[in-house]
Amino acid sequence: MNPVTRAKLDLIIAVTAFGTIGIFVRYIALPSSIIALVRGAVGAAFLWLLLRWKKTPFQREALRPHLKLLVLSGVIMSFNWITLFEAYNYTTVATATLCYYMAPVFVTLASPFLFHERLTARKLLCILTALCGMVFVSGVPQSGLPQAGEAKGILLALCSAVFYAGDISINKILDRVPTYERTMVQLAVAAVIMVPYILLTVDTSALTLTPLGAILLVIGGVFHT
């Protein structure tokens, strides 16, 4: 497979994973924080096994100088997941996903301050178009302001987009850190961050998991992460 075809295939897989996570989460009868914890733990474990299978050494020294940013990225990732999964409980998967797609807009707006990139007229036009689309997705032009539950879902999805934009920005700074190791640390940190939050907010004794839910959790941790 030539590099161009491989790149296109990778992009298709990434977009498919990115756009279908909400459908899977809908059918997992667990709190969003539990799903986020399992997703991080399973994802980190899968990458570790992948490195072992490929007989690739874990590059600790490459991570050491960037450890603080990696930890921060993992923390942001955990809040990104929680807010997105919570959004699915208040609005439709389609609406939450479209709001989540505002993340590149936030990255573009922050780029002049973080990366000294020029905010061109073309970029501003794209941002304006995205914002107009966001207004139409919210349903305001057709039915006025959304109901409280729907509005909460939209706001949670937008908060998730902000967190995701922060994660994208940090990963741009960490672009020279090996991909597998970087992602593994970020996922592990996100999972660890979720533990105290779950202990404080979730009655774990009342949790139940169906076989279908367990399968979807594993798929979410491996494919969607």
Question: What annotation goes with each model-predicted range?
Answer:
Residues 1-45, 75, 83, 146-173, ...:
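Glycine-/small-residue-enriched transmembrane alpha-helix faces in small-molecule transporters
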Residues 8, 65-71, 119-131, 153-154, ...:
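Cytoplasmic-side transmembrane-helix entry/capping segments in multi-pass membrane proteins
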Residues 19, 41, 48, 74, ...:
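Hydrophobic/small/kink-forming positions within alpha-helical transmembrane segments
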Residues 23, 44-63, 132-148, 189-213:
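Membrane-interface helix-cap regions at the ends of transmembrane helices
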Residues 34-37, 41-45, 85-118, 160:
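Specific alpha-helical transmembrane segments that line the substrate/conduction pathway
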Residues 47, 51, 71, 119-141, ...:
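Hydrophobic transmembrane alpha-helices of multi-pass small-molecule transport proteins
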Residues 55-95, 100, 136, 221-225:
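Specific transmembrane alpha-helical segments of multi-pass solute transporters/efflux pumps
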Residues 97-100, 116-136, 147-154, 207, ...:
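Loop-to-transmembrane alpha-helix entry segments
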